[in-house]
């Protein structure tokens, strides 16, 4: 179950960078912590540098293509205290490499 969720998260992260212009994608939450994971656990991703205009459409596309609920948050809108938690506990899945 964990391997499947991690694989899906990596696929989503790569798609966000390549197709939607994200600069960095960080996995956080239960999948990143690898505990209390259930079959229906959502995938939590913090995304930096992605344009805000199409944000909700992109979330919907990810849900449709992956078949799993995705909680996508824009890095730029997070409070500093939550950014610190994501940086400390999260896993960097993809970045644009520039």
Task: Enumerate the language-model features and the residues they cover.
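Catalytic core of pol beta-like nucleotidyltransferases
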Residues: 1-24, 32-39, 48-98
């Amino acid at each position: 179950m964990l391997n499947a969720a991690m694989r899906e998260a990596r696929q989503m992260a790569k798609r966000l960078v390549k197709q939607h212009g994200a600069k960095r994608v960080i996995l956080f939450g239960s999948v990143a912590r690898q505990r209390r994971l259930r079959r229906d656990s959502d995938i939590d991703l913090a995304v930096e540098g992605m344009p805000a205009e199409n944000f909700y459409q992109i979330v919907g596309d990810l849900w449709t293509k992956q078949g799993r609920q995705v909680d996508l948050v824009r890095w730029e809108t997070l409070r500093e205290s939550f950014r610190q938690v994501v940086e400390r506990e999260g896993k960097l899945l993809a970045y644009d490499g520039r």
